[in-house]
UniProtKB/Swiss-Prot annotation:
InterPro entries: Nucleoside_phosphorylase_sf (IPR035994), Pur_nuclsid_perm (IPR009486). Residues 1-22 form the signal peptide. Predicted to be a substrate for cleavage by KEX2. One of its GO terms (molecular function) is nucleoside:proton symporter activity. Belongs to the NUP family. Pfam families: NUP. This is Purine nucleoside permease. Gene3D superfamilies: Nucleoside phosphorylase domain (3.40.50.1580). Transmembrane segments: none annotated. It comes from Candida albicans (strain SC5314 / ATCC MYA-2876).
Length: 406
């Protein structure tokens, strides 16, 4: 290479080594060859906390409503009902469900996370952190199927939650290991940091309880209550009659009650009774357990962390679960017989009712965006919203004054 060419190349590189980009501004200055950074070159500062600015200046998608499904059976009714014409693939989504689906103008989008807490947290993190999506004003509808507590709902029923309670973060002993020493225990679960099932956990991880916007939940319930739900099959109707509870025997309806999160798929009277009590304990008597799910607390933990930095608005999240089956057996069946050999008429009503009950609030958001939903003021929360740590501010109406973090 000629010296003149080498000099030209070096000049070009020198010019390019000083550059700036927006949000945050980064400046890289060229140092002379063999120059050493001495102590006097380093400015004195008392702030050793590295920080960055937040925002997505290059985002091209700003959906008004986002539907969150967990697996294909929950996703497919939405794909059939909505005019999703765009498929968007971003890094970090489930390898089973790698696409986000959006309508023509990207006003409504849908994501499928994969089942379980890890899949939900991973996929929602990938979505909310992706620079292509500006989700600061987006409303999220978590819409999935769940097991139902027959005291409050039935097969095909629709539930909208104010609280999501994670029941798996506990000690656990096998029946053989506790029934002689603690015959009064309901189950082998014991809250962390205690040796008593009726004592609030002594230490927490922070994901045990989430509370969402009650006013927005109530608006979704108001709209969903005006539509005609799918009542299910003849088999559903016959199976409902095996229960003594009025709610279990009745036709599907929309109810306000709360969701449990557990990776472990449980059933039976023993665990249902314990987790119902645990729900009351964790929420200071405020929550009413009626649906069993596997993802909600994981999704809400991601939303909480991102809301703290302004990337999503936690006030704009709704949790809807439709009931595919009962979480405990009818009196005529054992838990084992019910779980492995039942014929309850199928889950088609719960899948259809995801769209039937979820569409009204989605359409309301889109149709009244400019007048109501963009600002969010009309349905802004009056209750506490967030986690047990008060990450988003305010004072939780559950928990206790202090506990150890684990």
């Amino acid at each position: 290479m000629k010296l003149s060419t080498l000099f030209t190349l070096a000049t070009t590189i020198s010019t390019l080594t000083t550059f700036t980009i927006a949000s945050p501004v980064v400046v890289v200055e060229k140092r002379a060859i063999n120059e050493t950074a001495l102590a006097e070159d380093i400015p004195t500062t008392k702030n050793n906390h590295a920080q960055t600015s937040y925002g997505k200046p290059f985002a091209i998608y700003q959906p008004k409503a986002f539907i969150i499904s967990m697996f294909s059976l929950e996703r497919d009714p939405w794909l059939k009902a909505m005019d999703f014409v765009h498929n968007i693939t971003i890094p970090g989504l489930s390898p089973v469900y790698p696409d986000i689906h959006c309508t023509t103008n990207y006003t409504i989008c849908q994501i499928t996370t994969g089942e379980g807490e890890i899949n939900a947290a991973s996929s929602i993190s990938a979505l909310t952190l992706n620079p292509l999506f500006d989700l600061t004003k987006t409303y999220f509808l978590v819409g999935g199927i769940a097991g139902g507590e027959p005291n409050y709902t039935t097969i095909g029923g629709v539930t909208f939650a104010k609280y999501a309670v994670q029941v798996g973060l506990e000690y656990q002993l096998a029946y053989e290991d506790y029934h002689k020493t603690n015959p009064d225990w309901i189950s082998g679960y014991i809250p962390y940091g205690t040796d008593d099932q009726n004592t609030y956990p002594g230490n927490v991880y922070g994901t045990e309880v989430f509370e969402v916007n009650e006013k927005l939940r109530d608006r979704a319930v108001e709209l969903a209550s005006k539509v005609h739900l799918n009542n299910g099959t003849e088999g559903n109707a016959k199976f409902r009659k095996l229960y003594n509870e009025t709610a279990a025997q009745g036709l599907p309806k929309v109810v306000k009650c709360d969701s449990l999160t557990s990776d472990n798929y449980f059933t039976g009277n023993v665990l249902n009774d314990y987790f119902a009590n645990f729900t009351l304990l964790m929420t200071n008597g405020s929550a009413t357990y009626c649906s069993t799910a596997q993802e909600d607390n994981a999704t809400l933990e991601v939303m909480t962390r991102l809301a703290k930095h302004g990337l999503v608005d936690y006030d704009r999240i709704m949790i809807m679960r439709t009931i595919s089956d009962f979480s405990r057996p009818p009196p005529s069946m054992s838990a084992y017989e019910y779980f492995f050999n039942r014929s309850d008429g199928g889950i088609s009503a719960s899948l259809e009712n995801l769209v039937i009950a979820g569409t009204p609030i989605i359409h309301d958001i889109v149709q009244n965006w400019d007048k109501i939903y963009e600002s969010g003021e009309k349905y802004s929360s009056k209750n506490y919203v967030g986690d047990i740590f008060a990450t988003l501010g305010g004072k939780p109406d559950f928990g206790k004054e202090s506990f150890d973090t684990a």
